[in-house]
């Protein structure tokens, strides 16, 4: 049977459920698909189908993630749900499932728990722009004062980690009642989706961002200057535009004199295209893999940054022993490895395999970077960790 063509008539948003174990993330995901299926906006997906999430590999790390899709009146959503806490940590740090927004699920019967905090913090660290809260299991709470108290606690927690706790929509409901087809259960799910539609901002499309292309390869064509190849990460490059070569060395200015794709000449290359770009007056030895081509002034090279990192466990093929301050692995950014030194916070003696941690890194050469950039940590060619730049230190 031929695959159904994906009709993209509505704007697309990537979203995910986050929150403490057993607070009802997977039940809520199932409930959303069941309620929206009634208006033809989704295919109803049962709890156990979502819970049996397939394993995927992202940058050498195995993560279990379930994906469902659905649509509301205004948007098309791809929704990700992870079965285990470790899967969330890995998912958010590696960016395996990009999230433009999140639904934080908190059980009204328990209130915020340790993983509630950790997921909010992670969402902040990795740059999830907005979230909406679903206060689940309200059918188990008879006392309205208690509900109010839990809502206050959630708002305080969100504010503590830098989200606008006073403004974030909090929807009260019961995923279980929605799954059972009870009207009050379904009403809450519809309210939740209205809040997600209106409160989570439309993401900026990759083509609308400044031009950036990580350089994968460099060739010289006799008599026709230098060609660099790579996949355009964001923005658009047009023939005749001035661009910068950033990272590893001093930033250089050059001009794009041609864009080639599959041996054909184009007027422009855009986000997602694998292209060759001809550079005017740039010598073969002045450019190398690991640098980026970028719109002038849009990105700067840096060698010191703070990062949120997940360290692979021994079972995942990571280190067998913890690492301590001044550990010097390779940091793999986009297309290249750069050696760097890790500085742990004063209160941390070591980082164990299987942990996630925050620390500072000092690279031996600067890399074109901005907050939110993902990287791998490698040692002798194998991946031992994955991280995201949370703050640049100059």
From Swiss-Prot:
InterPro entries registered for this protein in UniProt: EF-Tu_GTP-bd (IPR041709), EF-Tu_GTPase (IPR050055), EFTu-like_2 (IPR004161), EFTU_2 (IPR033720), G_TR_CS (IPR031157), P-loop_NTPase (IPR027417), Small_GTP-bd (IPR005225), T_Tr_GTP-bd_dom (IPR000795)
Region of interest called G4, as start-end residue ranges on this chain: 136-139
Subcellular location: Cytoplasm
Reactions the enzyme catalyzes: GTP + H2O = GDP + phosphate + H(+)
Residues binding GTP, per UniProt: 19-26, 81-85, 136-139
Record-linked Gene3D superfamilies: P-loop containing nucleotide triphosphate hydrolases, Translation factors
Keyword field contains Signal: no
Region ranges (G1): 19-26
Segments for region (G3): 81-84
Keywords: Cytoplasm, Elongation factor, GTP-binding, Hydrolase, Magnesium, Metal-binding, Nucleotide-binding, Protein biosynthesis
Region feature (G5): 174-176
A Pfam short name: GTP_EFTU
Summary of the function given for this chain in its UniProt record: GTP hydrolase that promotes the GTP-dependent binding of aminoacyl-tRNA to the A-site of ribosomes during protein biosynthesis.
Homology family: Belongs to the TRAFAC class translation factor GTPase superfamily. Classic translation factor GTPase family. EF-Tu/EF-1A subfamily.
Quaternary structure and partners: Monomer.
Protein name, entry field: Elongation factor Tu
Gene: tuf
């Amino acid at each position: 049977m031929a695959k159904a063509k994906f009709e993209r008539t509505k704007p697309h948003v990537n979203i995910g459920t986050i929150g403490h174990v057993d607070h009802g993330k997977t039940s809520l995901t199932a409930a959303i698909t069941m309620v929206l299926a009634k208006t033809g906006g989704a295919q109803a997906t049962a709890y156990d189908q979502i819970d049996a999430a397939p394993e995927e590999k992202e940058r050498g790390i195995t993560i279990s993630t379930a994906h469902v899709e659905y649509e509301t009146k205004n948007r098309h959503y791809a929704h990700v749900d992870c079965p285990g806490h470790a899967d969330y940590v890995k998912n958010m740090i590696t960016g395996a499932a990009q999230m433009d927004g999140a639904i934080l699920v908190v059980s009204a019967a328990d209130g915020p728990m340790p993983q509630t905090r950790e997921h909010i913090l992670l969402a902040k660290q990795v740059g999830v722009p907005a979230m909406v809260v679903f206060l689940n299991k309200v059918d188990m709470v008879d006392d309205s004062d208690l509900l109010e108290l839990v809502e206050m606690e959630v708002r305080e927690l969100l504010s503590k980690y830098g989200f606008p706790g006073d403004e974030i929509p909090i929807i009260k409901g019961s995923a279980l009642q929605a799954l059972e087809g009870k009207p009050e259960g379904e009403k809450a799910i519809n309210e939740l989706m209205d809040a997600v539609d209106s409160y989570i901002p439309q993401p900026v499309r990759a083509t609308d961002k400044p031009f950036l292309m990580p350089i994968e390869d460099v060739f010289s064509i006799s008599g026709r200057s230098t060609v660099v190849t790579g996949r355009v990460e964001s923005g658009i490059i047009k023939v005749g535009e001035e661009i910068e070569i950033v990272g590893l060395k001093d930033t250089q200015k050059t001009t794009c004199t041609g864009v080639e794709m599959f041996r054909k000449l184009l007027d422009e290359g855009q986000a997602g295209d694998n292209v060759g770009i001809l550079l005017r007056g740039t010598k073969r030895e002045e450019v190398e893999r690991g640098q980026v081509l970028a719109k002038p002034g849009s990105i700067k090279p840096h060698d010191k940054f703070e990062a949120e990192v997940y360290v692979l466990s021994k079972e995942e093929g990571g280190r067998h022993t913890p690492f301590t301050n001044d550990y010097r692995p390779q940091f793999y950014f986009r297309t290249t490895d750069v050696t760097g030194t890790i500085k742990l916070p004063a209160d941390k003696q070591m980082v164990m395999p299987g942990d996630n941690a925050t620390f500072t890194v000092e690279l031996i050469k600067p890399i074109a970077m901005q907050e939110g950039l993902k990287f791998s940590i490698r040692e002798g060619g194998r991946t031992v960790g994955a991280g995201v730049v949370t703050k640049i230190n100059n």
